């Protein structure tokens, strides 16, 4: 018994030393806790003093406005509600649109999400927001650059459709006579956005030339063709300078992986692409354990759970999933391209030296630890697999133009 503390008599010298170290560390922690308590008490006193001196209504208003912006960035609807309830924003489409258009301290992804909602107020705000853009005497690419920089386009097809429809109506109103209908403007706008992706996405190897871009847009002007000079100017503008897309979180991918649809350890088989004739035997396919994260219609895999950057990214766009039997591993499934004619899956991976290269898979074969986990992964991936909404909406709008033309024919 030492200083009122019981000490077993049969301790070895090493155990006594370890016990003494624990007691000493405990005492240090108690001292540290007391110091933190005193610092916290001082800080609270300072805060209370500051609040007591904040008699300025302007200062209080600014604090509430900053709080409202933060709330908007986390939940746009609740943020607007907070600002309206605190009389910082009038509950009219015009005032809300002006607040979003100025965008001070606002997350552009949150702006896009709010504008894309289908509720009556949101739709009115969308049209008021678009009306704040001045597109007069701008060509279509210039107008799109301005429009797409003011918010981040959401991923849902229905939201994109409403926003691009509003853009087309505004552009045609500002530039009467350029296109015969808003449908033409709508279709060409999507064609330009797709061209931007094709020309500047490193994963797209087949870069469309001017002739293909012109051919792609034949007959979209109420059944007629647009002037080739107009299409050439749009093509050159995109080729020379890609769209600048707002990135609220910079290049840090960490934010992407918050609240994923699913995550866990899986085994991934090496590249499935056939070897070139010049390389007999090809590379040996091996199974590698990777940490997979499913989010935002993409499958990311990491070497370790603590890695900030993924080793590979597999966009699920236009892919399908199926169960497969493998003699070497149980609980397998595959990602593949339906009706595949030899093309590789659009994906990328990071080599050991840091280089980012295109994936070399015609299929991705993956093994889960258990049957139950395999079923859950398949279910989650099936829910995330998407068909590019641009192609779906373009096809629907082109069909509408074609039907309209046939109806007008005698």
Curated annotation (Swiss-Prot):
- Which of this chain's residues are annotated to bind a 1,2-diacyl-sn-glycero-3-phospho-(1D-myo-inositol-3,4,5-trisphosphate)? 268-271, 290, 301, 311, 349, 360-361
Sample GO molecular function, one term:
lipid binding
Can you cite an annotated GO cellular component? growth cone
Major localization listed first in the record, in broad terms: membrane
Q: How does it assemble?
A: Heteromer. Composed of TAMALIN, CYTH2 and at least one GRM1. Interacts with ARRB1. Interacts with ARL4D; the interaction is direct. Directly interacts with CCDC120 through the coiled coil domain; this interaction stabilizes CCDC120, possibly by preventing its ubiquitination, and is required for neurite growth in neuroblastoma cells. Interacts (via N-terminal domain) with INAVA (via N-terminal domain).
The record's listing under PANTHER family reads: CYTOHESIN-2 (PTHR10663:SF343), GUANYL-NUCLEOTIDE EXCHANGE FACTOR (PTHR10663)
The name of this protein is Cytohesin-2
Q: Which organism is it from?
A: Bos taurus (Bovine)
